[in-house]
Amino acid sequence: MALPLLNYAPKSQNVRVEGYEIGSEEKPVVFTTENILSSSDMDNLIEAAYRQIFFHAFKWDREKVLESQLRNGQITVRDFVRGLLLSNTFRNSFYEKNSNYRFVEHCVQKILGRDVYSEREKIAWSIVVATKGYQGLIDDLLNSDEYLNNFGYDTVPYQRRRNLPGREAGELPFNIKSPRYDAYHRRQLGFPQIVWQNEVRRFIPQEKKLTAGNPMNFLGMARSINPAANTIPKVSAQNINIEASVPRR
């Protein structure tokens, strides 16, 4: 029997405050199947879903079957997002490379479009991972009232209210704020590190290069000379033999 979700109190984040600003280019672009007018619009929607879930999808990461089903109207955007979340790429990149707490943070950001409210919410969803498993957490987040009220079945999730008026910089994008791997796995993979295998040479302009006969060419040789000093040994007065030192007449 699965444990009920642990209660946690939401806090007044930006996503819980209704926006009153005039629409501008800073507002996030909403991709939904309700205003698809051409095949290029569907391509943009699919790319937006890949960016939201994977941040960057390579050619071998793409789910061609799910894309075809979405284009033909066999599945909704919510089903397409669910398929990406349950794919091997997402599982290998986020679930297997992070702890349950870190994985919960990634899922809340990517699915609900916000940060976790507190450590208590992080613990609550991590209990779901422990009791219902990896797929159980994905289903519970997609079936939650918060997801359905904000994105429904036809809208790609996005980071809600990242840019705010009156501030020079808004909230950081989730892909920068929360890297794919935590610090432990980044150390396992050996980065960040700098490996420099080439010889470091100093660039000298042509007009400053030394020509033949320039005394500066011999500066290195002069510095390398270490002449031995001719030191005079010190003799104590008590060790001087006066009788032996005075010549005989």
Curated annotation (Swiss-Prot):
Gene source species: Synechocystis sp. (strain ATCC 27184 / PCC 6803 / Kazusa)
Keyword Thylakoid: yes
Any single GO CC term annotated in Swiss-Prot or TrEMBL for this entry: phycobilisome
Disruption phenotype: Decreased growth rate, decreased energy transfer to photosystem II. Decreased accumulation of phycocyanin (PC), loss of the phycobilisome supercomplex and major phycobiliproteins ApcE and allophycocyanin. A double cpcG1/cpcG2 deletion has even less PC, but grows slightly better than this single mutant. Unable to perform state 2 to state 1 transitions (i.e. cannot transfer energy to PSII).
PANTHER family in the record: PHYCOBILISOME 32.1 KDA LINKER POLYPEPTIDE, PHYCOCYANIN-ASSOCIATED, ROD 2-RELATED
Classification of source organism: Bacteria, Bacillati, Cyanobacteriota, Cyanophyceae, Synechococcales
Keyword NADP recorded: no
Family according to the record: Belongs to the phycobilisome linker protein family.
Domain PBS-linker residue range list: 11-188
Chief site of localization: membrane
Entry keywords, A to Z: Antenna complex, Membrane, Phycobilisome, Thylakoid
Classification via Pfam families: PBS_linker_poly
Any GO BP: photosynthesis
PROSITE patterns given in the database record: PBS_LINKER (PS51445)
Function: Rod-core linker protein required for attachment of rods with the core of the major allophycocyanins in phycobilisomes, plays a major role in light harvesting. Although able to transfer energy to both photosystems, this is predominantly a PSII antenna. Involved in state transitions.
Cellular localization per UniProt: Cellular thylakoid membrane
UniProt-listed InterPro entries: PBS_linker_dom (IPR001297), PBS_linker_sf (IPR038255), Phycobilisome (IPR016470)
Lipid bilayer topology: Peripheral membrane protein
Subunit structure: Part of the phycobilisome, a hemidiscoidal structure that is composed of two distinct substructures: a core complex and a number of rods radiating from the core. This protein is part of a conventional PBS rod (called CpcG-PBS) with on average 3 stacked phycocyanin hexamers (PC, CpcA and CpcB). Linker CpcG connects the PC stack to the thylakoid, the hexamers are linked by 1 copy of CpcC1, 1 copy of CpcC2 and the stack is terminated by a single copy of CpcD. Ferredoxin--NADP reductase (petH) is also part of the complex.
Protein name, UniProt field: Phycobilisome rod-core linker polypeptide CpcG
